[in-house]
Curated annotation (Swiss-Prot):
<dbReference type="GO" id="GO:0090729">
    <property type="term" value="F:toxin activity"/>
</dbReference>
<protein>
    <recommendedName>
        <fullName>U-scoloptoxin-Er5d</fullName>
    </recommendedName>
</protein>
<keyword id="KW-0873">Pyrrolidone carboxylic acid</keyword>
<keyword id="KW-0800">Toxin</keyword>
<feature type="repeat" description="RLWRNWE 1">
    <location>
        <begin position="34"/>
        <end position="40"/>
    </location>
</feature>
<keyword id="KW-0677">Repeat</keyword>
<keyword id="KW-0964">Secreted</keyword>
<feature type="repeat" description="RLWRNWE 2">
    <location>
        <begin position="61"/>
        <end position="67"/>
    </location>
</feature>
<feature type="propeptide">
    <location>
        <begin position="23"/>
        <end position="94"/>
    </location>
</feature>
<feature type="repeat" description="RLWRNWE 3">
    <location>
        <begin position="86"/>
        <end position="92"/>
    </location>
</feature>
<dbReference type="GO" id="GO:0005576">
    <property type="term" value="C:extracellular region"/>
</dbReference>
<feature type="repeat" description="RLWRNWE 4; approximate">
    <location>
        <begin position="107"/>
        <end position="113"/>
    </location>
</feature>
<feature type="signal peptide">
    <location>
        <begin position="1"/>
        <end position="22"/>
    </location>
</feature>
<feature type="modified residue" description="Pyrrolidone carboxylic acid">
    <location>
        <position position="95"/>
    </location>
</feature>
<comment type="similarity">
    <text>Belongs to the scoloptoxin-08 family.</text>
</comment>
<keyword id="KW-0165">Cleavage on pair of basic residues</keyword>
<feature type="propeptide">
    <location>
        <begin position="112"/>
        <end position="124"/>
    </location>
</feature>
Amino acid sequence: MKTNCEFPLLCLLIVLVANVEGEVEDNELKMVKRLWRNWEDPEQRQLLDQEAEQEKQREKRLWRNWEDLELRQLLNEFAENQREKRLWRNWERRQVANEDDGEKPKELWRNWEDLKRRQVGRFE
């Protein structure tokens, strides 16, 4: 079990209090004692600090990757919506050009916009 404690005195106190109350197993107490010895040893403390820093960097990298993925998904969704709107505008223009009565394409366009609004409302 790999554990690292930023506040070894606090960790030791918590485990000791829990041990007095009988809530800590021997191996957990041994782990805390080992952590405390490592904390007292400058080389071990430096290794623990490096491991903690590497873990923080890894978490930052994972977070950035997740944010990048989320942004790409939003951009793709936006691009798809823009593409749909462009297709419908082009379709509407062709309908208006082909028909004498320009109300029907406008009504279809309004129906399509209402449908999209209802779909968005359903997912929010």
